[in-house]
């Protein structure tokens, strides 16, 4: 079974979940004992982290525009990553194209595909894109959609994306696995075509629907928390992510903050080589 995910963190967790003394098979059926790990090996995990909720999606996903956009997002000096880590992240822009080619090879060999997606914009867009991409290929496709929440005893745990799930937890969600019908695949493929035709700078989930929105759509969250009182950029972004978890990455808010600094709406009170370490306030 080939596992497809749309973010680096969740794909890394899935790789850890694969091949740990398999007890789980397709559609959540178990062979023996407790349901803990997902069968197979790490090489059966495909990461398509194209960030399709942002930017021009009329441009091909394997084109230079998408590569440059991904590098621009990953290439920010955010938390003081080591240089080799930053280089690895930038290289991901090229690796995603190779991952898509690898997926095509697996499908050509008759391997079934299981898509793990959520309602986070990057994941929903990735799922719609993939359904469109699969429309000209014969494939056995299953899906596992991340539920809004799960109850564990008297505790409710809410979820935003698969990146929040530990390697040992993935198998517990296989009860939600279902086959994707041809009609459903066509519906989602058409949804992607509509988004491409619209081609807004951003895509967001509004009232349950994936919708094209302007580039400044999430900026109100910055203005909601940024005041004339200086604050570390890391703290500001952390508060936005913590209090308003809309499935948007920290790098997007960092990019928008930088945009408003250049426009003179936000000022740098105390600069730093590491963007997230600098102190900022309203201009």
Protein language model features and the residues they cover:
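A short alpha->loop->secondary-structure connector
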Residues: 129-143
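A conserved mid-domain beta-alpha-beta active-site/ligand-binding segment of alpha/beta enzyme cores
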Residues: 157-231, 235
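Acidic, Ser/Thr-rich peripheral helices and adjacent loops at domain boundaries
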Residues: 24-28, 64-76, 154-179
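A structured, charge-rich N-terminal accessory region that forms the first stable segment of a protein
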Residues: 1-86
């Amino acid at each position: 079974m080939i596992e497809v995910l749309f973010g680096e963190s969740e794909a890394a967790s899935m790789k850890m979940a694969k091949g740990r003394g398999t007890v789980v098979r397709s559609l959540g059926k178990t062979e023996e004992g407790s349901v803990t790990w997902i069968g197979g090996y790490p090489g059966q995990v495909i990461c398509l982290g194209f960030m399709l909720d942002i930017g021009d999606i009329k441009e091909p996903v394997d084109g230079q525009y998408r590569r440059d956009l991904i590098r621009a997002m990953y290439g920010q000096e955010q938390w003081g990553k080591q240089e080799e880590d930053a280089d690895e992240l930038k290289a991901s822009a090229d690796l995603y194209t190779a991952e898509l080619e690898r997926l095509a090879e697996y499908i050509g060999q008759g391997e079934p595909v299981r898509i793990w997606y959520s309602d986070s914009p990057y994941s929903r867009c990735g799922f719609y894109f993939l359904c469109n991409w699969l429309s000209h290929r014969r494939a056995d496709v299953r899906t596992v959609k991340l539920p809004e929440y799960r109850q564990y005893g008297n505790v409710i745990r809410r979820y935003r994306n698969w990146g929040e799930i530990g390697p040992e937890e993935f198998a517990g969600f296989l009860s939600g696995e279902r086959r994707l019908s041809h009609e459903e695949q066509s519906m989602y493929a058409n949804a992607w075509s509509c988004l491409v035709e619209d081609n807004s700078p951003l895509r967001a989930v509004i009232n349950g629907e994936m919708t094209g929105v302007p580039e400044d759509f999430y900026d109100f969250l910055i203005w909601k928390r940024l005041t004339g009182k200086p604050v570390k950029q890391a703290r500001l972004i952390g508060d936005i992510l913590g209090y308003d978890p809309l499935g948007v990455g920290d790098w997007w808010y960092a990019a928008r903050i930088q945009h408003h600094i250049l426009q003179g709406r936000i000022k740098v009170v105390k600069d730093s080589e590491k963007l997230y370490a600098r102190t900022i306030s309203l201009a």
